Amino acid sequence: ITYTHISSNNYRINVTLYRDCNDGKLDNQGGGSSTSQGSYLTEAFIRTTTTNCQNKNIGSISLTKTGFENITPICDLNKSACGNNPTYPYGIEAHYYTGTINFDSYTQYNGCGFHIFIHQATRNEDINTLATEEEDLYNYVYINPWLENKSSPSFINPPNVLYNFNQPVRSGDYVSHNNNDSIVYKWSAPQKSHNSNIQYKTNYSAQQFISTYCPSGTNCTANPSSNPPQGLYLNSKTGDYSFTPTSLNQTSTRVIE
């Protein structure tokens, strides 16, 4: 979720949902052979974030779907699981939604920060590193329009979510920003509702969301310079990460903050 400053206290909210094309469709749209239907996304919600500001839901933002695209990282997208001639077993789509909010309608909360959030009924059923299956999907962006009017950082490229077994991964989740902000990257726990984290299975965590190569077994110190990369490394200043996946058919959750 990101936001774009339009004028005065008017903002556009931008939401992207990433869909596994082997799973249900979104809003009756998407490629692949699945006939099941996923959740419809029609609105985002607004809540204050501190006790002094009552820490509660205060409204909603209507969302309009603007389109979707196949972002599977292969040369012939039509051969992905999202395409019409699927010979590759995987496929990922990005589905885009937007809405607008005028914070002049919330002047009774002047000085308060807000979470703009979405809440969906279920996650992908194939995720196998979380302690409980098919928990709710909750995600948010923080904004305080009373301090200054500006746009949030935005991601430059779609996330890399498909990794090859025993092949080194050197990638990154990069953002652009024009406000001279200091950007820090970190991995955080997925959430199912406000301040309610989803637990990972034993040996997994937000910082170890996937099985990775470690010469000594598990929980080794990350070393991005080794060949292959050891552990799970994230550069908090640049967004670069590296690891070597060591489990077949593993589906996990990575939250970048």
Model-predicted regions and their roles:
Residues 1-257:
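Long, compositionally biased, intrinsically disordered segments
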